[in-house]
């Protein structure tokens, strides 16, 4: 079984129910709806197709809604794209002007107060580089350092500059409410800078009466400075290497990736590595050797999930991309699972952390064939998963949304089961589920972690070694 999960972005190349089912069959664990593009109606149709494909496959495929965030962009050019020549002056203004090769407007009204002479303005993921020479009222004068062709609405970055934009734009608020009402399993917040950015999202969720995990996209230098508190405040992290590689020197990105993965593992929260993982497969049938190594190294770093963006959303063969990534992951895991970085040993912790840590040790000691977490919220499964152990990890939950959310977590395979009322019900469910599908044999030992009494979220306090086929009183050994 593949442990590292695959997040695939939907888009024009995967827009029909048949195409989405192909991605699920190829190994997609979580579908990403990127709200930087497309309408609510289009994304709703994709959402419904994912649910249909998930039900048909018998797997809990998650749906991640990725909010656009307050990305700052250029305005429009009156006569189409323009060519910026190195050495030329170019003005970016908050005024509403028809753009040309001398000047263009911007959506960021705070630009003149954010920048000072000497600051860099990197347009279109750094392909075009401008340097600020002076600020004159609403106009920011720059000199073109690296030129090129620029078109309407291109995003730009201000590396090293604290940007005065809110955590959520008006569009993000509308999109978040829509996603919650639709039934998204989790949402991702773009351009997170501090733990405080989570507060507005949680306030909207409270207002809607719907709460789902919120992932912070780490793509700003301020997020790196505040990484530990961001990990604690959010429910997971996405290492968004696209904007991160523009905002930071490229040589720093791999180390940020490793640090973010380790911080999330210590906290028991999922972490996604994203951007340009198999980008050449947008048009080719095979990845480059460097891309294969990039995927392998993210696996060896201990990531929960790897994300495909344009490779699946607008690529020429999305299912092949997912299959290729799955093959690389499986091979690396089969050869090098023991090379993952170890966790720091905790001196003090919660009962749940103690029980899940002990369960990992007990499973190895007694030769358990599976670790099983009965969970209402998914937390106990996540706490076990952070140890990245060889023993297969199964989660049993009565909550369909928890099943879909755990699709993002390393190594977790989830069974949807009726609510249990007694610990004897647990072992009966384990016997029924695993023996019927041939996942375990009579006499094998499994280690079960649960809360007693059952059905109360956040009460993981018990562990049981169960001999398969002996369900009922006395089933533990």
Regions found by a protein language model. Name each.
Residues 1-477:
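Non-catalytic helical/linker scaffolds that mediate oligomerization, partner binding
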């Amino acid at each position: 079984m593949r442990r590292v999960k695959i997040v695939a972005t939907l888009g024009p190349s995967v827009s029909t129910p048949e195409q989405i089912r192909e991605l699920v069959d190829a190994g997609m664990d979580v579908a990403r709806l990127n709200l930087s593009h497309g309408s609510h109606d289009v994304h709703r149709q994709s959402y419904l197709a994912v649910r249909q494909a998930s039900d048909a496959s018998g797997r809990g495929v998650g749906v991640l809604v990725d909010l656009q965030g307050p990305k700052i962009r250029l305005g429009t050019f009156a006569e189409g794209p323009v060519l910026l020549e190195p050495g030329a002056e170019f003005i970016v203004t908050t005024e509403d002007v028809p753009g040309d090769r001398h000047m263009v407007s911007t959506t960021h009204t705070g630009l003149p107060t954010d920048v000072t002479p000497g600051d860099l303005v990197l347009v279109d993921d750094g392909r075009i580089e401008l340097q600020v020479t002076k600020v004159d009222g609403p106009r920011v004068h720059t000199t073109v350092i690296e030129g090129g062709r620029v078109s309407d609405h291109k995003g730009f970055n201000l590396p090293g500059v604290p940007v005065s934009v809110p955590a959520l734009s008006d569009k993000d608020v509308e999109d978040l409410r829509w996603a919650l009402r639709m039934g998204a399993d989790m949402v991702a917040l773009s351009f997170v800078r501090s733990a405080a950015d989570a507060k507005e999202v949680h306030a909207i969720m409270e207002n809607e009466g719907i709460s789902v995990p919120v992932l912070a996209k780490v793509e700003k230098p301020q997020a790196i400075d505040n990484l530990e508190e961001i990990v604690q405040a959010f429910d997971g992290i996405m290492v968004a290497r696209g904007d991160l590689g523009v905002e930071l020197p490229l040589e720093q990105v791999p180390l940020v990736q490793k640090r973010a993965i380790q911080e999330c593992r210590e906290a028991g929260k999922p972490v996604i590595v994203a951007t340009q993982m198999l980008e050449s497969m947008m048009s080719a049938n095979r990845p480059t050797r460097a891309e294969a190594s990039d995927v392998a190294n993210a696996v060896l770093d201990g990531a929960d999930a790897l994300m495909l963006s344009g490779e699946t959303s607008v690529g020429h063969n999305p299912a092949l991309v997912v299959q290729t990534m799955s093959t690389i992951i499986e091979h690396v895991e089969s050869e090098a699972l023991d090379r993952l970085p170890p966790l720091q040993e905790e001196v003090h912790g919660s009962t749940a952390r103690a029980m899940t840590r002990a369960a990992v040790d007990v499973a190895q000691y007694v030769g358990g064939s599976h670790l099983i977490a009965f969970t209402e919220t998914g937390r106990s499964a996540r706490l076990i998963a952070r140890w990245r152990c060889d023993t297969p990890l199964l989660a049993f939950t009565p909550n369909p949304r928890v099943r879909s959310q755990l699709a993002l977590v390393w190594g977790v395979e989830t069974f949807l089961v009726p609510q249990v009322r007694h610990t004897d019900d647990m072992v009966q469910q384990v016997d029924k589920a695993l023996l019927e599908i041939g996942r375990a044999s009579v006499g094998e030992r499994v280690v079960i972690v649960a809360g007693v009494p059952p059905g109360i979220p956040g009460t993981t306090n018990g562990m049981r070694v169960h001999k398969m086929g002996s369900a009922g009183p006395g089933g533990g050994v």
